[in-house]
Amino acid sequence: MEKNSNICPANRVRQVKEYYFSKKLKEVAQLNAKGMDIISLGIGGPDRPPHQSVIDTLCDVARRHDTHGYQPYVGLPSLRGAYADWYRRWYGVELNPDKEIQPLIGSKEGILHITLAFVNPGDAVLVPNPGYPTYSSVSKLAEAEILTYNLKEENGWYPDFNELERMPLDRVKLMWVNYPNMPTGAPATMELFQKIVDFGRRHNIVIVNDNPYSFILNDNPVSLLSVSGAKDIAIEMNSLSKSHNMAGWRMGMLASNAQFVEWILKVKSNIDSGQFRPAMEAAVKALSCDGSWYAELNKVYAERRKVAEAIMTQLGCTFDKSQKGLFLWGRIPEGEESSEKFADRILYGARVFITPGFIFGSNGERYVRISLCATEEKMLEALSRIKEMK
């Protein structure tokens, strides 16, 4: 485009920045093109395949001539039923598959659909600090006011409810929570979820729990919807990306009361045209996996976690060994200027990419995150490189 063009982007485009990983991975790609062979421990994208039966189902259904057309906006009945069975079996939550479940093209899109369904320009949204950056960026796109609430190490990375009660809550429509937490690894508990639901009910705030990590290095999967009456004011998003190694398949869902689901569908049905039927039928198969699937998955992650802990220790970082999920979160040494400079020094000095915590908010500034989504062999090589770093 010529520099003197009078065409400008919408104001909302000026409100958000390019996603950190989108920009940083370009830098990593440039380094790789120069032959630096960067080991990436940054992204939480599982490197292992789904169960073989899931892949077989995808291929078998894709070979049929009648499975390539548009599909229902609400997903296949069999998929909604499989999600309901999954919630009943693993979380002890009863859901009406016809009215209380909406499949998503990955749970990330649900952040947009939920925000557009509930938030008007000028409304306020409670967003955790540190937290997933998309909660804030989507709120900005919706022209909402962002109210960040603190998560701090001294409070176990849980909300300070006394502090929350002192915040200006009269215009708050949504509160984003994410337990088991990313990036901190703080676990979900029924006590925590009860407090969150009580807070939402007290202030007429819709609570949204983003719950993709509950099966990773976690013996007790818990759902916010397990709290009595939670469905009245709460929505939970879930995903097969991490729990079933299906990140690129974009298979997610949300669950809530029938009215909330209907409102969200009004938005969603005007944005996309459903999901690929072979992928949905394969997801049904994935959701039927028994406990041995999760046990084998976690056996692999447990071994990688040991190496991640060794890397953190070598870097002089401190960390909580009780963390859940797909990452390890650690506090950088006091002498380091910032998490960004610390991570860049490792990137250029050891050719290992880890995530600086500042991207998750100001409360993440003194922290870094290591992903478990690299082979144990690669992680051991990363450890070796860091040991040799000057």
How would you name each of these model-derived features?
Residues E2-G106, H113, A286-C289, K390:
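N-terminal small-domain helix-loop-helix segment of the aminotransferase-like
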Residues K34, A142, R202-H203, L315, ...:
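Helix C-cap/helix->beta junction micro-motif
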Residues D85, E165, E336, R345-T355, ...:
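PLP-dependent enzyme catalytic core of the Aspartate aminotransferase-like
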Residues A117-S139:
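Conserved PLP-anchoring active-site segment centered on the Schiff-base-forming lysine
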Residues L151-D219:
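Active-site phosphate-binding strand-loop segment of PLP-dependent enzymes
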Residues G229-A302, K306-L315, M389-K390:
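Conserved core segment of the aminotransferase class I/II
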Residues V284, V300-E309, F319-R331, G364:
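Conserved glycine-rich beta-strand-loop-beta hairpin in the small C-terminal domain of fold type I
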